């Protein structure tokens, strides 16, 4: 009988382990829920009811809501949340925030002629040190973010290229990053999360070694700036 009890205990531990893994997998898909749990902003019973169908499917059997509630209460915070305080300290060290307005973004299909046309465009505006421009190349397309005053020049230079999309009335928020920023896990996600929570869509992202630039609609730039500045220097 003692042996059977030991087997039952091991089997129960295996089930709990499987349940724990299933919960972690479900929450991994929902990072906002993870953070809400950490800050006690979500009702665990409601979360258990929401996750119950998915977890039951993952485990191949019905999982009771009460078992889910207990497992959620017992779980350890994920690694990314354990690093939250360290990340917040790093963000407080970020440099100045620079805002540029009156921008536009043009996306073209890549072609053999496109690099030469980009070079022509740069040669024309290189003497204007206040001009804002950025070229971002994907596998099949290239996006150019630039000051609106150079739109006519760009259209002239890019004549014959296939324009996929154009965005107008944009602004850019540039953050100065410490040299160690590339080693910080979750840095960009931290900003994406807060900007998204403020209801601001990000039109483009421009990243260099020591700068991160978020391009948003000009109507949203004040809210985006306030959001970033608040998390940089929390009250």
Report the location of each language-model feature.
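Long amphipathic alpha-helical segments
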Residues: 15-57
């Amino acid at each position: 009988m003692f042996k059977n009890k030991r087997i039952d205990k091991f089997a129960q531990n295996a089930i709990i382990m499987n349940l724990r893994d299933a919960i972690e997998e479900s929450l991994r898909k929902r990072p906002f829920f993870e953070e809400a749990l950490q800050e006690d902003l979500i009702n665990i019973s409601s979360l258990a009811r929401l996750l119950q169908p998915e977890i039951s499917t993952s485990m191949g059997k019905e999982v009771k809501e009460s078992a889910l509630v207990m497992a959620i209460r017992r779980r350890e915070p994920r690694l990314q949340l354990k690093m939250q305080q360290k990340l917040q300290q790093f963000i407080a060290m970020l440099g100045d925030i620079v805002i540029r307005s009156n921008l536009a973004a043009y996306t073209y299909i890549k072609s053999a002629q496109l690099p030469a046309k980009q070079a022509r465009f740069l040669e024309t505006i290189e003497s204007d040190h206040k001009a804002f421009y950025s070229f971002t190349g994907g596998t099949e397309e290239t996006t150019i973010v630039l000051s609106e005053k150079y739109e006519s020049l760009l259209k002239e230079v890019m004549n014959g290229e296939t324009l996929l999309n154009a965005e107008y009335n944009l602004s850019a928020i540039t953050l100065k990053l410490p040299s160690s920023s590339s080693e910080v896990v979750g840095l960009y996600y931290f900003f994406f999360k807060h900007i998204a929570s403020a209801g601001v869509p990000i039109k483009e992202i421009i990243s260099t070694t020591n700068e991160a630039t978020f391009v948003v609609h000009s109507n949203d730039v004040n809210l985006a700036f306030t959001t970033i500045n608040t998390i940089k220097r929390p009250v």
